[in-house]
Structure formats: C-alpha cells, structure tokens
Curated annotation (Swiss-Prot):
InterPro entries: Helicase_ATP-bd (IPR014001), Helicase_C-like (IPR001650), P-loop_NTPase (IPR027417), SecA (IPR000185), SecA_DEAD (IPR011115), SecA_motor_DEAD (IPR014018), SecA_preprotein_X-link_dom (IPR011130), SecA_SF2_C (IPR044722). It comes from Mycoplasmopsis pulmonis (strain UAB CTIP). It is a peripheral membrane protein. This is Protein translocase subunit SecA. NCBIfam families: PRK09200.1, secA. Belongs to the SecA family. ATP binds at residues 85, 103-107, 491. Monomer and homodimer. Part of the essential Sec protein translocation apparatus which comprises SecA, SecYEG and auxiliary proteins SecDF. Other proteins may also be involved. Its EC number is 7.4.2.8. Its main location: membrane. It is found in: Cell membrane; Cytoplasm.
Length: 867
C-alpha cells in the first residue's frame, strides 16, 4: 500500500516534507542575508563553526547556512540557486539520493550541503566518476567555497602520499570514487601511522551515485602485486577450449555462465590425461579451463573489452568508457590474453581488496545525486539505507517520448533507422544515436558511410575526443553515434537553430540492462525545459530478447516483415525481459556483497589490530596475548597428545625450546613440565617465556633505548600480519572460486564459503600469533649489536625524514643508503650527547660536544654527498 501511495504524485516522503519546510525558512531568511556586506557574509563561516563547537547541531543551523550559501553562490557565480536546487541540497544533507534531471544544475545543488557539513571541520568529500569532472567542479565551485573561507583540494591518482595528505586536510576534497577506495586500502598497508593520508570517513556526496553504487558494485577494488606464474597453463587451457564444439559446453544466456557437459568433460580428461577432471587435486586446472571457456565463448571483443596497443582494455558496460588501469582478476585477464594471442602477464596476487558497497557504507553520512535512480530505490534502501527523492524540474519537461518501434530482425531495424535518420536530417535537427556496444556503433557507421550520411562516432575507441564530440552534438545538422551515453559528464546544449527545428532527437538502437540507463539516454534531450524528442528502435535479435525472452519462439509467432511489429504483446516481452535482467543484476550485486561481508568482518578486525599496533606506545600487552594464544594452540595440537590421554612431554619440551628459546640460556625441562597439573601447564609455559623475553628486552632497552625496541617489535608484528593477511585473502579468493564446484554435490556455495572461510580466519589469527611470537624471540637482530643498530638507525631514519622540510625531503631519500645511515647515526650520537648535558644540568657550550654530521671531512663541498 505504501509503495502505491509513493507512486501518486501528491504523496511526499518524510525527507521531502522536511525539505519543503526548511526551504520556506531559507526563503524567509533571504532578505536579511542579501543586505550583508561581503565581509559580513564571509564572517558567517567563523560564526557557524563556533556555534557547532559550542554544541549546536547541523540540523539547527541548516536554514541559515543554506541562505548564506545561496547568497554567496549568487555573488560569486552570478547564479542564484533555484528553489528546486535548494530542495535537492536539503535532501542531500539528509543522507538521501536526489534525483535531478539532466541540465537541472546538480553541481550548484551540491554547494549548500557540502558547505554545511564542512563546517564541522572533519572533512567533506565530493566524489565524481572521472578526473576531468573532479577538477572542473573543484575549480568552479571552489570559487564559492574560497569566498566562504573554506579550503578546497583535488585528489589525483598521480599525487605523492605527502600531497594526498595535504589534500585530505582541506575542508572539501574532490576526487574520483575509485581513488578514494584505493587510498583507504593503501592507508591500511602503511607501517607508520603518520603515513596515512585520509583523516576519517565523515560525509561524502557522490555525483552520478547510481553509476558508482549500482553499476560498479560488482567490481571490487583490488591492490595487486606481481606473482610469478607460468603462462604455459593459460596457453594450454586456451588450446583445449579451441578444440570444443558447441555441443561440448552449455551457456546460460541469462547469467552469462558456461560449463562443460559430459562430452566436454570426456574431451578434457583425454586432453589432459586425467581420470576425473573434477577431482579436488585438479581444482587449479578446472579454474584455468573455466577461465578459458569464459574468455572464448562469453567475453566478446569490442563489447566487454578492446585490444589497444597489444593490451587488453576493459570497457565499462554502462558508460562505454575504457576503464583505465583495470584488469580482470583471478586469471581471467590472462585467459583473454591467451585467446587474443597477446603476451601473457603474470597473474597478480591480491594485497588488499574492498567492494564499493562496503567502502562507501563506512562513511558517517552518505548522499548522492543523479538524473535517474527511482527504478533502483529498493536497492538503495536495502544496501545503503538511502531513499530516492525525485526533485521537481525548474521548468516543465516538454520532451516527447515516442512509442518504441520493434522489428523482426537486425537488418529490418537498421533499414528503419537509416530511413528515419535520412528523413529527420532533412530539417537539420540534431540526432544522437545511442548504442549499447561498439559493434553496433560501427555497424551504423559503415551503413551511414555507404549512404553518404555525414556523422560522428563516439565509443571506447574514440574516448579521447569525447568532450569535443559531445559539445558539437546539439548543433544544427549534427548526427552523433555514441556507445552508452550514460555517465558522460558533459551536457548536450542544442543551439538556437537546433531548437527551432525540434531540439535534440535521441534515437535508441536497443534497450539496455536497466530502465535507468535508457532514461539517462532519453534525458540527454529536453534539458531545462527545452523541446526534444526520443524514440527506441528495437528488434527480436537484440541481446535483451536473446538472453531473457526466447527470441526464437517469438520469431515463430510473428511472421517476418520489413515493417514495424506494432504489438502490445511484444512490448510486454521487452519490458518483462528488462525487469528480469534488472532483478538478476541486483541478485548478482547482492551476492557480491554477501561474499564481501564475510571478508569485511575479517578485514575490519585485521585493520583495527594493525592500527592498535601502529598507535600503541607499549606493545607488551599485544605480545603477551600472542604468546599465550600460541602456547594454548600448541597444547591443543594432536602431535603432542598421547592416544591414552596426556601429553608427549618429550616432543612438547623439544618443540617449545626449539621454537622460542634457541637464543636463550634458559630451557624448559621435561621433568618439570611432566610434574605439572595439565590445567597449569599453559600458564607455567607462558609465564616463563615472557619472563625470559622481558629480561632480554630490558637489556636491549638499556643499550639502545625504548623507542628503538618499540620500532623493532612493531616492524615484526606489522610485517607478519601483512604477510599472512595477504595470503589469507588470496586463499579466500580461491575458496570462493572452488566453492562454486560444490554445486555439483548439491551444496550451497555461499554456506560452504562462509563455514570454511570462518575456519580459515580462526587459523589465521593463531598463525599470526605463533609466527609473530617466534620471530620476536628468535630474530637475530635482537641479540647481535651490529644488526640491532641497523634496526635502530632504520627507525630513526624514518623519524628524521619526517622532520626534514618537504622541499628537501625527496633529495635526502635519493642519497646512498650507507651515507644516510652515517648521517642519522651521527645525529643519534648528537641527540644522546645533548640529552646527557641536559640531564646533568651542565652549562657547557653545546658547540664543544657537537660532532660532524657529515662523516668525511675531505668531501668536496660541491659534490652531491656534501650537499
């Protein structure tokens, strides 16, 4: 009932009721704000910050802040935000999605909520889909923010950590969405807490929110490292795939999955000389074969990817853009390289990963704006707890959205499009033709060339000319073929002459996987109350029908014809197929989230443990916990238990002495351990191990100082956690791939993944504790003075680098390591000498104890080393 009420125009959400009430308050304040001088208007920022610090809430000061923001925007940009833009801004501050049609001024709408949340001085992030938009919006809107005493920065992938840290310290940071996620992952790989660049996840406003949170939700962010692997198996798997006939495998068109049938399995057993392909020992080979099948029979060139400069470049299915720097994971990239006979790169090892869904859900407040999101509202509610609020247009929408025309086959559809373009172009009306695949755009390109129709093509292959092509698409006589216009950041503005002949004509050549994407294409026409027209030309050969509506059966029902098949039944088939694939894609995204939620809980525990180690000034409590966990695990190990009960004390004693006490004089005695009550054994071993560790630790502190020992302990703990965690997430990746194989045994893959993943994580915690404690007890640098000095110098070197002025820091890093060590070693001696003087309260001239920082007095003063 509630859902039906929301579809009635006069039904308003709670957010919209709040927004309208607040808008009235803003408008009531406007006369008084207009009379403020520039200085008085600017000083309002200081007043708002003070009031927030004194306890006022953002909600309480929202009307005043929005009124000030509106006036500042009017004075700086010479544009007074419309009431509907203020409504949109309030919705954004409420942590919801503002659905605003193309051309309604989303960028200006963002100013007020960003300004309001930046007043908390905790940092606000505005995320865009590409770097061009981030720089453009930061430059244009930054003028308003600067006027209001707010600092603005742009986060770029090319920046150094030092530069990024400064950018994140700004009141407002603009960034592409992927870089935010990568910065978060990198922050959780640092070995010094001061090297983190982000300062907390407070408030984020996502432009094109549906593109980021829906379309890209299935693509996890991954930081990878090189891992040696032979290209031979990819090539062999590809050779096998090329021997198969269509009857050897089965493709599920709906899910785009593929599997071998009995004849294919028999061929695999013969090809690889196996008795049973699906034996557990062959799981790695099955994974390679599965990727080869996907690469050869599912992944299509110029649809999912292109080959450019002998490299595989991925295509964003929703925007048509090349996804720079992206690659398929889990060996699929290498399988496609083998298919295309390209050089096969090493398969990478995952070092850190997170999905967009789980990353953005960590923000204290999340909001977004887009032209189309209402059709996906349930997903926004279920996953992000965000409602979608359509914002009224400033001027009525007068674009005409015509009925779809459906044709029997591709040839008939193309002929109809050609005829329509010829007819419409006679008046000079600009035409934008939207295709979903590069292959379609190039088909039309050839057809138009053959018929002498002057046109321009925009797809992933011409991505570099995008801005120029789009800027001309609204001019008289312009005919533009574009692959997936969704996500394009530049508005098409029809010229006066074009508006006089009907405005922009949007012609869709097929339905996409989402009504939302189709609505975005339509929305390119009729911006800001302009006249416009849209129409879709479809056929029974379109991918949507082939995958989800049984094209062959429909072709049997409807006789072949050159004219459009005007049938309500057919239109229902297209509509139902689109809803079906929307549901399938939602389930797919939900599955990705479910699997990532398992690793998310583990990741949060690992990252919190890491942070605890990085910030703690005393790590003994961590070390004690790890030693006790290790001892407890050893005593539960079956190799030390006798069949008739009790322990094999000989083995147990040898193992503990060998693992922890090699460098120590103290050793456990079998006779002593065997006389203890079993329940007291763990505590006794733990207490004695820690006692020995503390003796040596104190001796090292006396020699080298507590800071050096802390640095040494921290380094061992962090490096062990990182190494084992990285191995774990790669193990979890393989577990997920292999868990799909249990479907053959009628088991639930997700349940298998969850159960086995939990056991793996429990073991991971124990292994980290065991290896960390063993390294701390046995690391040679703790007992050899020369190596301990190296550890100490390494720690001081980083501390010294942090103190160097930024202008000189990079130069110091380029010096030879031995010279850096000598400089820092001398500085340590100098610090110790000064400390000695201060502690003895001596007043002697410090010059008398100053040593030469540069060790070699004979260095030429003009040399790099002297500098």
């Amino acid at each position: 009932m509630i859902k039906k009420l929301k579809e009635i125009p006069f039904f308003k959400s709670t957010e919209m009721k709040i927004a309208e009430k607040t808008l009235q308050q803003i408008n009531d304040l406007e006369p008084s704000v207009v009379n403020l001088t520039d200085e008085e208007l600017q000083n309002k920022t200081d007043e708002f910050v003070r009031r927030i610090q004194e306890g006022e809430t953002l909600e309480h000061i929202r009307p005043e802040v929005f009124a000030v923001s509106r006036e500042a925007t009017k004075r700086v940009l010479k544009k007074r935000p419309y009431d509907v833009q203020m409504l949109g801004g309030i919705i954004l501050d409420l942590g919801s999605v503002a659905e605003m049609r193309t051309g309604e001024g989303k960028t200006i709408t963002s100013i007020a909520p960003v300004y309001l949340n930046a007043l908390e001085k905790k940092g606000v992030i505005v995320s865009t889909v590409n770097e061009y938009l981030a720089e453009r919006d930061a430059a244009e809107m930054g003028e308003v923010f600067s006027f209001l005493k707010m600092t603005v920065g742009v986060n770029k992938p090319s920046m150094s950590p030092e530069e990024k840290k400064q950018i994140y310290q700004c009141d407002i940071t603009y960034s592409i969405h992927s870089e935010l996620g990568f910065d978060y992952l990198r922050d959780n790989m640092v070995t010094n807490i001061n090297d983190k660049v982000q300062r907390g996840l407070n408030y984020i406003l996502l432009d094109e929110v549906d593109s980021i949170l829906i379309d890209e939700a299935r693509t996890p962010l991954i930081i990878s490292g090189g891992e040696s692997s032979s290209s031979y198996m990819y090539e062999v798997a590809n050779q096998f795939a090329r021997t198969l006939q269509p009857g050897d495998y089965e493709i599920d068109e709906e899910s785009k999955t593929i599997k071998l049938v009995d004849s294919g399995i028999d061929k695999a057993n013969k090809f690889f000389t196996l008795s049973n392909l699906y034996d557990i020992k062959n799981s790695e080979l099955v994974h390679r074969i599965q990727n080869a099948l996907r690469a050869n029979f599912i992944m299509k060139k110029d649809v999912e990817y292109i080959v450019k400069d002998e490299k595989i470049e991925l295509i964003d299915a929703f925007t048509g853009r090349i996804m720079e720097g992206r690659a398929y994971s889990e060996g699929l990239q290498q399988a496609i390289q083998a298919k295309e006979f390209l050089e096969i790169e090493s398969e990478t090892k995952t070092l850190a990963t997170i999905t967009y869904q789980n990353f953005f859900r960590m923000f204290k407040k999340l909001s977004g704006m887009t032209g189309t999101a209402k059709t996906e509202e349930q997903e926004f509610i279920d996953i992000y707890n965000m409602r979608v609020n359509p914002i009224p247009t400033n001027l009525p929408n007068i674009r005409v959205d015509d009925e779809d025309s459906i044709y029997w086959g591709t040839r008939q559809k193309l002929n109809a499009i050609l005829k329509e373009v010829k007819q419409v172009s006679k008046t000079g009306q600009p035409i934008l033709i939207g295709t979903s695949q590069i292959e379609q755009s190039e088909q039309l390109h050839q057809l138009f060339d053959q018929n002498g129709i002057v046109h321009t093509v925009l797809n992933a292959k011409q991505n570099e000319q995008e801005a120029n092509i789009i800027s001309q698409a609204g001019q008289l006589n312009a005919i533009t073929i574009a692959t997936n216009m969704a996500g394009r950041g530049t508005d098409i503005k029809p010229s006066k002459e074009a508006l006089a002949v009907g405005g922009l004509y949007v012609l869709g050549t097929d339905k996409s996987e989402s009504r939302r994407i189709d609505n975005q294409l339509r929305g390119r026409s009729g911006r800001q109350g302009d006249i416009g027209y849209s129409k879709f030309f479809l056929s029974l050969d379109d991918q949507l029908i082939l995958r989800f509506a049984g094209a062959d059966k429909l072709k049997e029902i409807f006789p072949k014809s050159e004219e459009a098949l005007n049938s309500k039944q057919l239109k229902r088939h297209f509509s139902n197929a689109q809803k079906k694939i929307e549901g399938f894609n939602y389930d797919s995204r939900k599955t990705v989230l479910n699997y990532d939620d398992v690793i998310r809980q583990q990741r949060e525990l690992m990252y919190s443990q890491r942070d605890l180690i990085l910030v703690s000034e005393d790590l003994l409590f961590v070390i004690e916990r790890m030693v006790f966990r290790s001892v407890d695990d050893v005593l539960k190990n079956s190799m030390f238990l006798l069949k008739n009960g009790g322990f094999d004390y000989t083995k147990l004693t040898e193992y503990i002495n060998d693992q922890w006490l090699k460098p120590f004089d103290f050793k456990f005695e079998e006779s002593k351990l065997s006389h203890l009550h079993e329940k007291d054994l763990a505590e006794y071993i733990f207490q004695n191990l820690m006692e020995q560790y503390m003796i040596v630790r104190q001796r090292l502190i006396d020699s080298f100082g507590e800071d050096s020992i802390l640095y040494h302990e921290r380094s061992i703990l962090i490096s062990t956690i990182d190494s084992y965690w990285q191995n774990h997430i790669n193990s979890m990746d393989k577990l997920r791939s292999n868990s799909n194989m249990v479907q053959y045994a009628q088991k639930n893959p997700y349940q298998v993944y969850t159960q086995k993943g939990s056991k793996k994580f429990e073991r991971l915690i124990v292994e980290i504790a065991l290896q960390s404690s063993v390294k701390l007890f046995n690391n040679p640098s703790a007992y050899r003075q020369d190596q301990m000095e190296e550890v100490m110098i390494e720690g001081y070197t980083q501390e010294f680098i942090d103190k160097i002025p930024e202008s000189e820091r990079e130069y110091f890093k380029t010096l030879p390591q031995d010279l850096k060590s000598k400089i820092v070693k001398n500085l340590i001696q100098l610090e110790q000498s000064i400390a000695m003087v201060e502690s003895n309260d001596q007043s002697q001239d410090l010059q008398s104890i100053t040593i030469d920082i540069l060790p070699d007095q004979n260095l030429n003063n003009s040399s790099d080393e002297a500098k």
